[in-house]
């Protein structure tokens, strides 16, 4: 998954889509500059959302500058690659990869286990640099590592709380924006938002991994809990996420963040088990043919490598954002 958070629709948010793109590509630039050129490929929507939150709650305006991302021959566009929230998101992204590889080396076997161990060794210098950067900002790195180490304990003692380690880690990561920006009064709301985000990430991954986990005999909470219990947990967590997002006092980009929340809900409708309106049902029913006719991109663009923008447009007419062949593009409910 490229991230739980859905990217905004380029048509519906045409005025603010450059903000998402500038944050996404600013994050990619930090990853490349600080942790190696290949590290830019780690850029993802969840980390971009974290960076955008910081840009939006900061009373000081972003430091936009014209730059390119992955294609030096592209036309420069506004990015922010020095804001504390962006550099924080980059550091936790690198550490997140290290955690993922560590989990894979523990859970997998054969070639995948070997590849995970090799990958961990290769990224070790970048991880060390990311941890050092986090420590210089008073981020509780050791505490988060301990939280993640408790994962198996939560799984063994209470499957319904198997999401606890991920929730606490995301909560700590998101709440640290308050420390970085000198906004201690926002820490509770940010922690609530991050914790809910982490729980949703955990349950979505578990939902997606049911078949491989069953095949390999790995723990999955869906094998140990009644579906109604899981549904209630997910829906209450989604309610926490949306309420926390609403409670934050944004100085800018509030419309974009609201749309991202709506688009994320639409993207995960089946997983969330939420009721859809009649209009949404009709829209989903007819969307596949329309999107195939229009080029299959659903009008999203995060976007870095293809949209920088040397690749030919698919379909006829439209801008890069309208015909972008980028990462998989989630369909927007308002197309």
Question: Where do the language-model regions lie?
Answer:
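Acidic catalytic motifs of isoprenoid enzymes
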Residues: 1-192, 199, 203-218, 222-233, ...
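Primarily interfacial, aromatic-capped hydrophobic alpha-helices that serve as membrane anchors
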Residues: 229-272
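Cysteine-dense, membrane-associated helical/juxtamembrane modules
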Residues: 266-335
